[in-house]
Amino acid sequence: MAFFDNTRKPTGLGGRIMVSMMNIGHRSLADWGLKYLKLNNDANVLDCGCGGGANIKKLLKLCPNGFVKGIDYSPVSVAKANKVNRGAVSIHCCVVLQGNVADMIFASEWFDAVTAFETVYFWPNLLQSFKEIYRVLKSGGTFLICNESNGDTDKDEKWTKIIGGMTIYKDAELKTYL
């Protein structure tokens, strides 16, 4: 496996390094995106493709009386996210699970908000994943997709040649799927 393939599904030592790097490297983008997410103190939030758990930690601060769940299909990511959020996990206001966004175990209409930071690029069945998110999201809830790349530059497309299974969607494409 090439090192950058660990952005899609982190495994082994390279994956552990990658999730730590993503926790740092995506910080500015996440801070920017979270400014647009309005949450009540007691909100229930799901972070899809939660990676190393840095955004779960931020979400917990935004809804201190709520509950934050994370899901990722990489065991390496789940382990790191649990470690980063061990305090919240230990007091039962957070849980991080291994799973597939296209087929989630969560109850219907349970989440006030669902987030996806730098992850929809790697979802093989985007339409099914969005249907599942719609199912678990409460009526009137918010789905925040926060991507650095939107396919508007050649720089964006270079990553699809480096990382297998990566698709960069233009804004209009994502809106069509939604």
List each model region and its residues:
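A generic alpha-to-beta junction signature in SAM-dependent methyltransferases
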Residues: L37-L39, L62-C63, L137
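Class I SAM-dependent methyltransferase SAM/SAH-binding core
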Residues: N44-D103
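Short glycine-dipeptide loop
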Residues: D42, L137-T142
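Conserved alpha-helix/loop element of class I SAM-dependent methyltransferases that forms part
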Residues: I24-A43, K58
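A short SAM/SAH-binding and catalytic strip from SAM-dependent methyltransferases
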Residues: D112-L126
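A short glycine-rich, Lys/Arg-flanked "PGG" loop and its adjoining helix->strand segment in the class I
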Residues: L127-S139
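A short acidic, Gly/Pro-enriched loop at the edge of an enzyme's catalytic core
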Residues: A102-V114
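C-terminal alpha-helical "lid/dimerization" subdomain adjacent to the S-adenosyl-L-methionine
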Residues: F4, P10-N23, T142-L178
